[in-house]
Structures are given as C-alpha cells and as structure tokens.
Amino acid sequence: MGLKRKKISVIGSGFTGATTALMVAQKELGDVVLVDIPDMEDPTKGKALDMAEAAPVQGFDAKITGTSNYADTEGSDLVIITAGIARKPGMSRDDLVNTNANIMKSVTKEIVHYSPNTTIVVLTNPVDAMTYTVFKESGLPKERVIGQSGILDTARFRTFVAEELNLSVKDVTGFVLGGHGDDMVPLIRYSYAGGIPLEKLIPQERLDAIVQRTRTGGGEIVNLLGNGSAYYAPAASLTVMAEAILKDQRRVLPTIAYLEGEYGYQDIYLGVPTILGGEGIEEIIELDLTKEEKAQLDKSADSVKNVLNVLQ
C-alpha cells in the first residue's frame, strides 16, 4: 500500500474558503477540494483552476479541484467549513444564526456520509453556535469537531500590541478566550512580548484600548470593507489549525472546544487554550483565572448560550 497525500475539503468558495484553499495548498498540507452549491460550481472550478495554475510558479505540489458534488470529498482527512451567509454592516451575529445553522446541518450530513473518520474545523459565524450545531449533527467525537476564533482574535491582539510597542509580531504572545464576539476575553496576565509581561511594558489605559479594539476587530473590518468581512487573517488562522492537525504538531492554540466541566461549563462550545494535534483537540488546558477573568468568561459563555437559545 503506497503512501497517499492527505485530502482537505474546504466547504464554501467565497473569499475565506478560496483563500484558505490556496494557503493550505501552498503549504503542501494535502490535495484540496473546494466545494460550493451547484449555482456556484463554475466559479468554484474557475477559482480552483486559477490556484492550480499558480502551483508551477510558486513551486507547490498539491492538486486543487472545484466541485459542487460532495462525492468528490470522499475520504477527506480534514474538512474546513466556511460556508454560510456573511454578516453585513449593522447586522448582529445573531441574525445569522438560523440561516447558517440550517446550512451547517445540510453540509455536515454530506461530509460525514463521505468522510466518516474526518476531523471538522468550523469558521462560519456565529462560530461557537455553528460548531455546536455541526458537532450535534455529525455524531463525531467532540475532539474532532473544532471551531476557529481564538487564533484570529489572538492574532488581532498581537498585531495591535506589536504596533503599540513597535516590535516584531513574532515576539508577542497572548491568549484570547471565550466566545467570538464582543464579550471575548483577552488574558493580559498570560500575554508577553519577548517573555516580558505586557503589563510591565504598556500602561493600563493603552492595554484597555487594545483589548477593546481586539473585541471589535471583526466589526472594524466589516465597516471598512463596506461589503463582506475579513478573510485573509481568518484563512491564515484556519491554515495554522490544519497544519497542527495534519502534521500532528501538538500546538498550544486557543480553539473552540466542547466543554464538559472544564472551566465549570457543561455542553457548550467555547474558546479555550487547547493542544491541537493529529487527534484534533488532544487536551484542554485549564488556566487559573482571577475572579474578574472568570466573571468575564462567564459573561462570554452566557452570550454563547443566548445564541444557542436562538436556534430553532
């Protein structure tokens, strides 16, 4: 039995899906199948062909194909879901809930039919509730259904800190926990620049401003674009997760995980520090939180529960 390349299916060929497909192919993480609805099949094939023709120029070996037929996803090692309607200016994430939940259900049925042993990463907003929906619909073990938000939120936080200190983003580390909304919890105590705690480098009022900008980071881009939402940084975040899983890297990354008692929460998907590897979420890291941090996380968890309650 010869070795085969890994297979990655990306569901949704919009800006985020297409950018993710290209990024995972450029890293040679596996062959990529880009999937969209039948009405979008030709544009999806066109995008895939365009990317495939970049391969000889950039020197990466990965097949990229476009389709609307889920049979083409059969045997996927990893499936990334970006499908769904996007948030428009003035629209709350909650407005998206039921439309996108129905999309998640139909997509998940197809995925697990053709790839019963896959791992699924969800990006579609509101992501905590959509990941929960996919988990319940899929029947997969909890560690193999994972949501993306913490890497993106942490990346935004690190960007703003690096700007503030005029330092390399590589030297800034941090953790943003909780839901992917205005109640997310950037943990300043666990955030460093070159190993030095941020509280020693940045005055409190500037830190507070950075935290606030991080919380509204997605909305800031939505408003600037005027049509659509962020996709480069979200795609980069998905690619980091894909690499950690497909290469069994056991990276410490904030992801949206199913909690059964961790941090005191039950039956909820919430952003927490995890070890991400070949089995998906291999471990949930429970940090010691102050009363204030725990109260913030409680508020964030309540926001996620409120969205779940909107689900019909």
UniProtKB/Swiss-Prot annotation:
One of its GO terms (biological process) is tricarboxylic acid cycle. The modification Phosphoserine is found at S149. Keywords: NAD, Oxidoreductase, Phosphoprotein, Tricarboxylic acid cycle. One of its GO terms (molecular function) is L-malate dehydrogenase (NAD+) activity. Pfam families: Ldh_1_C, Ldh_1_N. InterPro entries: L-lactate/malate_DH (IPR001557), Lactate/malate_DH_C (IPR022383), Lactate/malate_DH_N (IPR001236), Lactate_DH/Glyco_Ohase_4_C (IPR015955), Malate_DH_type3 (IPR011275), NAD(P)-bd_dom_sf (IPR036291). It is an enzyme of class 1 (oxidoreductase). NAD(+) binds at G12, S13, G14, F15, T16, G17, D36, N100, L123, T124, N125. It catalyses: (S)-malate + NAD(+) = oxaloacetate + NADH + H(+). Disulfide bonds: none annotated. Substrate binds at R87, R93, N125, R156. The active site is at H180. Its EC number is 1.1.1.37. It comes from the Bacteria. Catalyzes the reversible oxidation of malate to oxaloacetate. Belongs to the LDH/MDH superfamily. MDH type 3 family. This is Malate dehydrogenase. The gene is mdh.
